[in-house]
Amino acid sequence: PTPSVEVPLVDFFCDPNGVRDEVNTLLVNKRRGYNAYFPMPFAKSGRIELVYDGPVEPGEELWRLMPCYSYVMYRTVDAMPEDCGYLHASWRQEALLLGARDYLALDAKGRGKFVGWNVTMRLPGRDGYPVDQNEKFYIDGESEASVEFQGIEDSFGFSWGFPPTESQFPLTGFYRFMKGAMGYRFFVQDAISFEKSLRVMIGFGVNEDPMFRREFSKRGNSMQLSSTVYWYQTEPHAPFPAMLSA
């Protein structure tokens, strides 16, 4: 069996480049330690692994450079609800011409609910980034998304672009990522449910100014996006994309 959660450590905790002193959200936070508060039900067993795949061999030198310890709080129950979903999280990263095709953040099969994500966006080697992409949620095989946010900043709680200063709130927030931006949002009371499948994509909407599609279809205008998506679903889950090696 494959893990239900497979994400780079810092991305899981809404700190994609790993340099922030502090992250404050309702479900994950960071300040001299990483903490997560997602409910993580399991019926028979649960296993959490932190995998290091860097160049330093295990031993005293690695411990000196990267000391690590952890604790997990859990409780056992006599039975779980039959329809109880399991926490899933998956990470993706891609550089692409958004004027030519959309970015795929999630392609889930099964029954469940989407509860949040964090997304980074940047134009490598350049200042600034477009914010006119829409976030599209195709539920149960839809050909047209029944949930679509207009403008990437709007779905993270802002409008007319991201603000000039970083903002952290319990469920939404934004901060700088290299020369681009990172936004997070958790859908606690407004989770997006699906019965058979959910496909989440980022791209220009059908009513977008054609100029944006032309501009971001040109060679050299590739946009780099990454995303960590959090959702609950019944098993089995569809295979995750392969993780990039360090």
Residue spans for each PLM region:
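Beta-strand-centric surfaces of beta-sandwich/beta-rich domains
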Residues: 1-246
